[in-house]
């Protein structure tokens, strides 16, 4: 296996749908998240804002099933191809990149956040 | 236009082929690189290792012509869809993500670095 380089303990990760090739989201893994992703096949990340490990889908149930992992030429960025349950974005869109920079909505809404995130 | 958020002066950027949807590379823009990309339609980045602005293709001639820019839900990551001249990676592959984490080569080689990078 090619060993990724964690800069300041973190590895940037691009998440892409393995069938449609839509880019779904961008996040970071620390060593623990990377190891858990490899061992379980479910994407785990490190939340910089919350300062802790984050199993994607632990609240929403929208897990990411990892089909393939690729690493870039410098070994400091990861591309993972996943099967995404329902949607990746907390706003209800399948992809976090659902808007152009001009503000046009180009993504597909796949769930209602109010139905999923209940306190 | 939706204003991106530059954390510590930098914005992570995912670069995707606008036709094949192949993820080509990952880089960072500072404010100057972002503005130049918007005004010229040619991708510019900020090289963290060299500490300076970097017009992609300035040495190789392999420019990236920006077709669309998308921003994520948090406005702190950019996805740009480009027409890539020849190849994006300095190793000669079209994409920097030409290997799986297991080390299998899955990308296409599109040029010989020795022919392109001459001192």
Curated annotation (Swiss-Prot), chains A, B:
According to the UniProt record, what class of enzyme is this?
Answer: hydrolase
Q: Which residues bind Zn(2+)?
A: 73, 89, 96
Q: Which reaction does it catalyse?
A: 1-(5-phospho-beta-D-ribosyl)-5'-AMP + H2O = 1-(5-phospho-beta-D-ribosyl)-5-[(5-phospho-beta-D-ribosylamino)methylideneamino]imidazole-4-carboxamide
Q: Where in the cell is it found?
A: Cytoplasm
Where is it chiefly localized? cytoplasm
Keyword set includes Cytoplasm: yes
The entry lists its GO molecular-function terms as: magnesium ion binding; phosphoribosyl-AMP cyclohydrolase activity; zinc ion binding
Q: Which residues form the signal peptide?
A: none
Please verify whether the record's keywords include Transport.
no
Q: Which pathway does this polypeptide act in?
A: Amino-acid biosynthesis; L-histidine biosynthesis; L-histidine from 5-phospho-alpha-D-ribose 1-diphosphate: step 3/9
The enzyme's E.C. designation: 3.5.4.19
GO terms of biological process kind = L-histidine biosynthetic process
The protein's matches in InterPro entries, at most eight in alphabetical order, are given as: PRA-CH, PRib_AMP_CycHydrolase_dom, PRib_AMP_CycHydrolase_sf
HAMAP family hit by this protein = HisI
Q: Which PANTHER family match?
A: HISTIDINE BIOSYNTHESIS BIFUNCTIONAL PROTEIN (PTHR42945), HISTIDINE BIOSYNTHESIS BIFUNCTIONAL PROTEIN HIS7 (PTHR42945:SF1)
User: Into which family does the record put it?
Assistant: Belongs to the PRA-CH family.
Subunit description = Homodimer.
Q: What is this protein called?
A: Phosphoribosyl-AMP cyclohydrolase
Q: Can you name the source organism?
A: Methanocella arvoryzae (strain DSM 22066 / NBRC 105507 / MRE50)
